Amino acid sequence: MRHRHGLRKLNRTSSHRLAMLRNMSNSLIEHEVIKTTLPKAKELRKVVEPLITLGKKPSLANRRLAFNRLRDRDSVAKLFDVLGPRFANRPGGYLRVLKFGFRVGDNAPMALVELLDRPEVDETENVQEAE
């Protein structure tokens, strides 16, 4: 029986799984929205939400804990300088996982993972800049 095992193995070794989730976390923090498979997205939520909670309390110890998990200075800086203050009043649930259809090659269920309260990008400004 597999009672109380809260982790999906995702058909990977533990080191590969750790590296994959670390890379996906860094990508999500940098771009604020990523597209991946649904099981990976659900596991990513378990990794990123505690990191954002760490970012809400800016201390040296929390920065070191976040760096230990992310291993990227730019991601840690954004986590504490941008995302922590943005989610200061939200008690949890910082991510949204949206089902995004199925992948063409293998029909794997896809998902869009995004941070909530993202600043809206005005598309008319982008069109004017392109012209």
From Swiss-Prot:
Pfam families: Ribosomal_L17. The keyword Ribosomal protein applies. One of its GO terms (biological process) is translation. Gene3D superfamilies: Ribosomal protein L17. Keywords: Ribonucleoprotein, Ribosomal protein. Part of the 50S ribosomal subunit. Contacts protein L32. Belongs to the bacterial ribosomal protein bL17 family. This is Large ribosomal subunit protein bL17. It comes from Burkholderia cenocepacia (strain HI2424).
